[in-house]
Amino acid sequence: FLSVTEPSLLGDGGDLEIRVFISDDFDGELFPRGVVDSDDLPLNVSR
């Protein structure tokens, strides 16, 4: 991403410019589903 203004013109600390792309066309899942079987991972079960 290239800023439109020169860095010397930003002032004291500068401005934070962020671009966010939001789409409602999402076919995937946010979290993968599956089973992990490992002795290295501790089992944490609370009542």
Swiss-Prot record:
Belongs to the heat shock protein 90 family. Keywords: ATP-binding, Chaperone, Cytoplasm, Nucleotide-binding, Stress response. InterPro entries: Hsp90_fam (IPR001404), Ribosomal_Su5_D2-typ_SF (IPR020568). This is Putative heat shock protein HSP90. SUPFAM superfamilies: Ribosomal protein S5 domain 2-like. ATP binds at residue 47. It is found in: Cytoplasm. Homodimer. Putative molecular chaperone that may promote the maturation, structural maintenance and proper regulation of specific target proteins. GO terms for molecular function: ATP binding; ATP hydrolysis activity; ATP-dependent protein folding chaperone; unfolded protein binding. It comes from Populus euphratica (Euphrates poplar). Transmembrane segments: none annotated. The keyword Protein biosynthesis does not apply. The keyword Cytoplasm applies. GO terms for cellular component: cytoplasm.
